[in-house]
Amino acid sequence: MIPSDHFVRFYNEVFKFLDQKKGLTDFYLEISRHQEIHCLELFRKKGLEGMEEYWGHIRKEENCVSESWIDGDVRYSHMKRCPSLSKVLDNDAEPFAGYCEHCPGWVGPLMAKCGFYFVDNIMGERVPECRSFMTKDREKAECLLKEWKKQYPEGNFRTNFELLKAQK
């Protein structure tokens, strides 16, 4: 098995290559399709609780410094120190500018298949921190996004709203 220190370096270089070849979006969609094996039914059956179950396991496995919580019909996550980007920043290769795009790149389409609106705020391409939320309520998602844009004016927001619109 390849150690995570090496894996993220490899990922970083693959992202650079695929970006040059204009294939990065397709790669993220393929990752999303593969992730369905692990979590699509869990998210459909258990909703936000299933997401807590899945990402709680990932948080431990990848040694993430993060917290998540459910407030009513919204699941929030705050990745305080992303281990993946931290490792990319701590090596001799130049980090791919869009490294953090891989998370919303695969999570957004998966959330759309489950009927959830997803917003991710990537704090900066060299800042290993992000915040996200998921909800089935479109109005609430739009309202929360508007609030976050005020709260984090320097934010780099990604949503899956268009994917959900296309499904309806």
Enumerate the predicted regions with their spans.
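Anion (oxyanion) recognition and catalysis
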Residues: 112
